[in-house]
Amino acid sequence: KATHILGLTATPLKLQSNLGETGPYSKLVMLTNRSKNGMFFKFILHVSQIQDIVKLGYWSPLEYQSYDFDTGALVYNSSGAEYTHDSIARSYENQNIGNKIIKKVAEMADRKAILVAVPTIEQATNLAGRIPNAAVVHGGTPKDERKQIIKEFREQKIRVIVQVNVLTIGFDYPELDCLITGRSTASISWWYQFVGRGTRIHDNKKNCLVVDFVGSVEKFGKVEELYYKQDGKENWELYGEGKKQITGIPMHEIGIHLEGGINLSEKVDEDGSIEKIYMTFGKYKGKPVSSVPPYYRKWMVDNITWGPWNIKVKEEIERLGNFK
């Protein structure tokens, strides 16, 4: 007699980096293609889109505030799946993110529980020391001390926790009503998990405010706008706000491709030739390289680490020449 088994999960996806011909690319791993030793579940019958979950009232409403951030100095690590720790920390310092966070926290008297993400322990300690009623949590925080800080945070004796690579997965505090990110990331998984801390519903909060100082909203879009789409009979891909393609493309091109094969870094003429190369990072992101002031093109040549993620821009700068 045939047996039918229905699988249900609240975490249908896993994002991983695979090595392809053009370097690391992002892959959406569903329940039907996770194992190399055969699949227990053969078919996906239904996917609940995040938009549906929001409409049904299972997520707290999210509000976003985004600020200008120059991604030009960020460098991908050897895996191609994330930026290097040093370039993340330098960008935080060079763009004065700490002072911006301090000013923002002071403006938000209505927010009762604020979780802040920054790159390093030193930066977290410095920041928390300049914010009233704040504490630091990181991987080296003693277990008992961490438990006490979180307890006082839940009791609203501590208003702000500044964290370094912790409290991103599995941390559940429904009254959390503000998230601030000062940590750059190339990982949609990190962004999804971090914002997810604020999606729990609670009678004492009307929404969760997400304050982005590092360009994550521009790169990935709002988390509640992510959606899954089946590509053919078996493959699924993840897309974001504005139909940005998140998976199935090189990691360094997330935020550049749109659903339907549109590449935002190139403008193609009717005859199929490429008319212009567009900036894919930095303060002139979205502008033709040819319109970038010569002094800034010269600065990029002298300061940017070049790789597959920005090589087209470098080639266009070299073609244009003339930095005067």
Model segments located where?
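Conserved nucleotide-binding/hydrolysis micro-motifs of P-loop NTPases
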Residues: A10-L15, D52, D68-A73, E122, ...
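DEDD superfamily 3′-5′ metal-dependent exonuclease/proofreading module
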Residues: I246-K324
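Conserved helicase ATPase core of P-loop NTP-dependent helicases/translocases
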Residues: L115, A124-N126, N133-T168
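Conserved interdomain linker/interface between the two RecA-like ATPase lobes of SF2 helicase motors
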Residues: G38-L115
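A conserved SF2-helicase RecA2
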Residues: H46, I50-S60, H202-L264
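SF2 helicase motor core recognition
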Residues: G57, V160-L179, G196-R200, G286
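Conserved SF2 helicase motif VI
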Residues: P12, C178, A186-C208
